[in-house]
From Swiss-Prot:
Keywords: RNA-binding
GO MF entries: RNA binding
Entry coiled-coil feature ranges: none
Keyword RNA-binding belongs to the record: yes
Ranges where the record places region Disordered: 166-190
PANTHER family: HETEROGENEOUS NUCLEAR RIBONUCLEOPROTEIN
One Gene Ontology CC term in the entry: cytosol
Protein name (Swiss-Prot/TrEMBL): Probable RNA-binding protein 18
Highest taxon listed in the record's lineage: Eukaryota
Domain annotation RRM: ranges: 25-106
InterPro entries recorded: Nucleotide-bd_a/b_plait_sf, RBD_domain_sf, RBM18_RRM, RRM_dom
Cited Pfam families: RRM_1
């Protein structure tokens, strides 16, 4: 008996070698023609073995709501069935597009340091955006006041100290209208 050897296209061979790192038999099938139906794709996949799970994805919202996303996931019963599906389907024409079949892998969340850094204002007071120099001084003054209180508490540890005063916002005075409200300005815009 001679063992039958098949030569694989280089691309398919590299895809199959990635499968040794995979746990399970889940494939990603992409570049799907929008006209291909879930039923026809499932029938095509069942030719390669028993399909345990099949996820055909659709757009959930937006202008394309209800239309296929262009890819799906399939779980086969055995690894051999999944490998056979990769060999036969990768690069094959389905309607007007060539299918792309790969081993599915978990999406890795990458932390982007630049994207997630939040720039916080120097002070969270409402006046900080209009008067940055005043807010810098008020922060410095607050730090000095806290340091002085800590020093005083260190010198007299048995004394009772009043609770910190309620934080007061330095709200700029309300601007007064220089002209009366008029509806004529609104009518001219229409």
């Amino acid at each position: 008996m001679e063992a039958e050897t098949k030569t694989l296209p280089l691309e398919n061979a590299s895809i199959l070698s990635e499968g040794s790192l995979q746990e399970g038999h889940r494939l990603w099938i992409g570049n799907l023609d929008p006209k291909i139906t879930e039923y026809h794709l499932l029938k095509l996949l069942q030719k390669f073995g028993k399909v345990k799970q099949f996820d055909f994805l659709f757009h959930k919202s937006g202008a394309l709501e209800g239309q296929p996303r262009g890819y799906c996931f399939v779980n086969f019963e055995t690894k051999q069935e999944a490998e056979q599906a990769i060999q036969c389907l990768n690069g094959k024409l389905a309607l007007s597009k060539k299918l792309v079949v790969r081993w599915a892998h978990a999406q890795v969340k990458r932390y982007d340091h630049n994207k997630n850094d939040k720039i916080l204002p120097i002070s969270l007071e409402p006046s900080s955006s209009t008067e940055p120099t005043q807010s810098n001084l008020s922060v410095t003054a607050k730090i000095k006041a806290i340091e002085a209180k800590l020093k005083m508490m260190a010198e007299n540890p048995d004394a009772e100290y009043p609770a910190a005063p309620v934080y007061s916002y330095f709200k700029p005075p309300d601007k007064k209208r220089t002209t009366p409200y008029s509806r004529t300005a609104w009518k001219s815009r229409r």
